[in-house]
């Protein structure tokens, strides 16, 4: 067989293979379609049907040619979906493992935040009103969330709980407890100031119903009491407790 003939046969083989490949890609969705999208994992806020519909709209190709990277991104665009893992299951199934975000608190006006400080905003979804509220810059979410969890655990040990935790752009920290009392921690030494409150929490509650506990002093705090607090226990509605030093 001459060199020219071998070259011609090589070209013909490449054309045949190329044509076959083109035909396969063209007809593969028909010959090997994805007939079932199987959702696994805990899907509380987006039903399996809703996620299936989103993936079906985005699906192009069959079991061999479907773009799993694109489908993964589509699944993770749903606000509650933290991570999606997709794999092909022969002959006609796409299996999707879903891990949803699990919020521990509301975040500012329209968001939720996870224990890791990941902020997400369900578009058109309901925000659970029974969760505590955290407020601050999104960039500080990991720090705020970590402090919320640590402080909540410490407060629970003295029978208290956090309803709202906020930090403003100046770094001024405030806590509102489930009892209605507000703690002013200021911008510095916030851990020490909270510890000061914890050490006196029982005595404060025994003395009356504090509305505001201002801990922004170098040594001590001031208390604003509820109007109906027993006047026999205290001398003045704005009595200062263990106050010393300048407020910061």
From Swiss-Prot:
It is a single-pass type II membrane protein. Keywords: Cell cycle, Cell division, Cell inner membrane, Cell membrane, Membrane, Transmembrane, Transmembrane helix. It is found in: Cell inner membrane. The keyword Transmembrane applies. GO terms for molecular function: phosphatidylinositol-4,5-bisphosphate phospholipase C activity. GO terms for biological process: cell septum assembly; FtsZ-dependent cytokinesis; intracellular signal transduction; lipid metabolic process. Residues 26-248 are periplasmic. Residues 1-4 are cytoplasmic. The chain crosses the membrane at residues 5-25. Residues 32-101 form the POTRA domain. It holds the Pfam family POTRA_1. One of its GO terms (cellular component) is cell division site. Its main location: membrane. PANTHER family: CELL DIVISION PROTEIN FTSQ (PTHR35851:SF1). Essential cell division protein. May link together the upstream cell division proteins, which are predominantly cytoplasmic, with the downstream cell division proteins, which are predominantly periplasmic. May control correct divisome assembly. Belongs to the FtsQ/DivIB family. FtsQ subfamily. Part of a complex composed of FtsB, FtsL and FtsQ. This is Cell division protein FtsQ.
């Amino acid at each position: 067989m001459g060199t020219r003939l071998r070259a011609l046969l090589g070209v013909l083989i490449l054309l045949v293979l190329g044509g076959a490949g083109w035909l396969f890609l063209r007809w593969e969705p028909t010959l090997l379609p994805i007939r079932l999208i199987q959702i696994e994992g805990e899907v509380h806020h987006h039903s399996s049907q809703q996620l299936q519909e989103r993936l079906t709209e985005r699906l192009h190709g069959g079991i061999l040619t479907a773009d799993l990277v694109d489908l993964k991104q589509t699944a993770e665009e749903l606000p509650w979906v933290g991570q999606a893992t997709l794999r092909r299951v022969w002959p006609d199934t796409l299996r999707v493992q879903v891990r949803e975000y699990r919020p521990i608190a509301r975040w500012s006006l329209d968001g939720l935040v996870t224990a890791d400080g990941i902020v997400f905003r369900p578009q058109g979804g309901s925000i659970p009103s029974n969760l505590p509220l955290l407020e601050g810059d999104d960039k500080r979410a990991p720090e705020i969330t970590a402090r919320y969890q640590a402080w909540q655990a410490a407060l629970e040990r003295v029978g208290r709980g956090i309803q709202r935790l906020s930090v403003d752009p100046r770094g001024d920290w405030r806590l509102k407890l489930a009892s209605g009392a507000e703690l002013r921690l200021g911008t510095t030494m916030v851990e020490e100031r909270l510890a000061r409150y914890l050490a006196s929490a029982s005595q404060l509650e025994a003395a009356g119903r504090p509305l505001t506990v201002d801990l922004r002093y170098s040594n001590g705090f001031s208390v604003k009491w509820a109007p109906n607090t027993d006047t026999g226990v205290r001398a003045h509605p704005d009595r200062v407790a263990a106050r010393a030093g300048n407020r910061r």
